[in-house]
């Protein structure tokens, strides 16, 4: 079983454009914090950045490939297709999806989720849920910023 972490990212955010490329401190960008944290996962085999094929996201591609992190590029609007094509390209049998706006992601939480997924017969697990009763409600079971999905 090949477990791949896919960090989905883009610069086209409407609330805070290019936030992942903002400087977090004197040494690192926001995306670097996520990468650095997830490199400590003991149960994943590979990490890939998945961004769009838009020119504005060339900056993400250049930055992460300079760090020797693979970068997959795909359609901006169809995020699920981007994940599918990325997983297919890298032969992932299990996808760990991490949004790029989670710089404090805990690799222990990620590994615990991978372990739970591997020991179950579930097709999908996450450490948060969305309740649909005429509105969408985020129901975190872990602190904000530590969300992980596996499928």
Where are these regions (language model features)?
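Short beta-strand/turn micro-motifs composed of small residues
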Residues: 9, 51-53
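A short, N-terminal amphipathic alpha-helix
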Residues: 29-47, 66-67
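Conserved acidic residues
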Residues: 3, 45, 93, 123
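Short phosphate-binding loop-to-helix
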Residues: 53-120
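Short glycine-enriched, charge-decorated loop/helix-capping segments at active-site entrances
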Residues: 20-25
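Conserved core of the sugar-phosphate nucleotidyltransferase
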Residues: 105-151
């Amino acid at each position: 079983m090949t477990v791949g972490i896919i960090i989905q990212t883009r610069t086209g955010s409407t609330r805070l454009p290019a936030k992942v490329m903002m400087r977090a401190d004197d040494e690192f960008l926001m995306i670097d914090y996520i990468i650095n944290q997830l490199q400590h996962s003991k149960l994943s085999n590979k990490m890939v950045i998945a961004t769009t094929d838009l020119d504005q996201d060339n900056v993400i591609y250049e930055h992460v490939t300079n760090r020797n992190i693979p970068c997959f590029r795909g359609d901006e609007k169809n995020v699920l297709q981007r994940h599918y094509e990325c997983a297919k390209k890298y032969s992932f049998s299990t996808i760990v999806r991490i949004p790029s706006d989670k710089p404090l992601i805990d690799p222990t939480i990620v590994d615990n989720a991978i372990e739970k997924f591997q020991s179950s017969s579930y097709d999908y697990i996450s450490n948060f849920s969305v309740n649909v009763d005429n509105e969408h409600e985020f129901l975190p079971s872990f602190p904000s910023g530590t969300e992980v999905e596996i499928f």
